[in-house]
């Protein structure tokens, strides 16, 4: 067993009527797991806040690895995560508030070694103050997310690249803002900053305006910062 684990909590993306094969991020992650061979996946589904918290606690109870990374993959909108409606507008799951989700993450992170959190949800990354508050009151070193309504396939591929490089950081690298930003630079350099990853109200948003990275190095006296601009500068996307 490797020393690294990826905890994956995935909400429903589509109804069976809309996409009967029920697409999931799991096969993409399993491909990375088989390719790298140095981490293990703990996967759960959730439909509402109680299910989210139970899934997270169960995964942590079963994980024996020293280094943990959390990937939350679900619908996002404004300040809600995991909501899903049927085509006729009826709510299948109401999801949960972002503040509720982050409160749960902070609580478990104080007793589990969660190094980083990837929020694979539309628009949630725009709530930078919430990300910084989460880092301030937890040992989590970084949070990455998206600030607009992202396309599913492209964002999933970006998530895979981000996880590959972020999980490759050494423990001592987490003391350095430069090295953390460097890992995300390497992950995103595979893509074009001009790629129109978001579609909103008759306009498109390029990848360079869609990402959000908050960091708090693991060292005494460190404070959380929004390092999105530094990341864009390193990529040459600013």
Predicted regions and their residues:
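A domain-level signal for caspase-like cysteine endopeptidase catalytic cores
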Residues: 1-69, 75-76, 83-95, 112-114, ...
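Active-site-adjacent loop/helix micro-motif of nuclease/hydrolase catalytic cores
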Residues: 80-83, 128
């Amino acid at each position: 067993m490797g020393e690294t684990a990826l905890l994956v909590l995935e909400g429903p993306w589509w109804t069976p009527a809309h996409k009967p094969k029920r697409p999931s991020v799991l096969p993409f992650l399993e491909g990375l797991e088989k390719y790298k061979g140095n981490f293990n996946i703990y996967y759960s589904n959730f439909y509402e806040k109680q299910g989210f918290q139970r899934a997270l606690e169960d995964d942590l109870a079963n994980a024996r690895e020293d280094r943990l990374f959390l990937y939350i993959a679900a619908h996002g909108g404004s300040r809600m995560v995991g909501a899903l409606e049927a085509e006729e507008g009826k709510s299948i799951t109401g999801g949960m508030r972002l503040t509720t989700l982050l409160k749960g993450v902070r609580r478990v992170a104080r007793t589990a070694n969660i190094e980083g959190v990837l929020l694979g949800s539309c628009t949630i990354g725009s709530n930078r103050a919430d990300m910084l508050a989460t880092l301030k009151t937890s040992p989590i070193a970084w949070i990455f997310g998206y600030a607009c309504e992202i396309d599913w396939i492209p964002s999933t591929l970006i998530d895979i690249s981000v996880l590959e490089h972020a999980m490759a950081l050494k423990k001592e690298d987490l003391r350095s803002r430069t090295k953390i930003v460097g890992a995300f630079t390497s992950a995103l350099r595979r893509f074009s900053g001009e790629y129109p990853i978001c579609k909103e109200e008759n306009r498109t948003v390029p990848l360079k305006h869609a990402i959000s990275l908050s960091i708090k190095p693991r060292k005494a006296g460190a404070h959380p910062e929004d390092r999105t601009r530094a990341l864009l500068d390193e990529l040459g996307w600013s």
